[in-house]
Regions:
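Preference for long, amphipathic alpha-helical scaffolds in soluble/luminal domains
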Residues: 1-173
Length: 173
């Protein structure tokens, strides 16, 4: 695992500000992109999972070698939380649904609203790092978002896995 994390560490985007900087000009870059060599579009859920893996390695004896990367990833994720408490994949507060009615928006992906599955991974990361709803505004707001978006049947929708099983297991984990 350490070899893989050592491969991931230098791929953290620390000096390129993508589109997200428009809404969060005071937030420093600190995420990882799901695509190789795409520093303009780091994403929040992959960043959360990389941070969790680095934290697990740290607890398993890797020492402080990942501390700076973890701290910067957490800083970026917290800075990217949307007003409603959730997190989106790549952006923040990008919720102008009318944009999906533009004729060339045939797949309805011109916006990047907060989603349950991405929010769940960010919440999981914060909890794994020892934050609680009592001492972390970001975690408290994220949990509130998940409570608000749970459906009457108990499930959550997963945008990126495109089904309710995906969204529900992501939230429960």
């Amino acid at each position: 695992a350490v070899r893989a994390l050592d491969w991931l560490r230098p791929r953290q985007v620390l000096d390129v500000a993508g589109d997200w900087i428009t809404r969060r000009p005071d937030v420093r870059p600190g995420g990882w992109a799901f695509q190789y060599a795409n520093p303009h579009y780091p994403d929040l859920d992959d960043t959360a999972v990389v941070v969790m893996a680095m934290d697990r390695a740290r607890r398993a004896g890797a020492g402080a070698r990942y501390d700076v990367a973890i701290d910067r990833g957490v800083e970026w994720i917290k800075g990217m939380q949307s007003r409603n408490g959730g997190w989106a994949a790549f952006d923040v507060d990008n919720v102008l649904h009318y944009l999906n009615n533009i004729p060339f928006a045939d797949h309805g992906a011109l916006i990047d609203p907060p989603t349950e599955d991405v929010t769940a991974r960010c919440v999981s990361m914060l909890a794994q790092l020892g934050e609680t709803v009592d001492d972390s505004e970001a975690l408290s707001r994220g949990v509130a978002y998940l409570r608000e978006t749970q459906l009457a049947d108990g499930s959550w929708y997963g945008r990126w896995g495109l089904n309710y099983i995906y969204g529900t297991w992501a939230t429960l984990c």
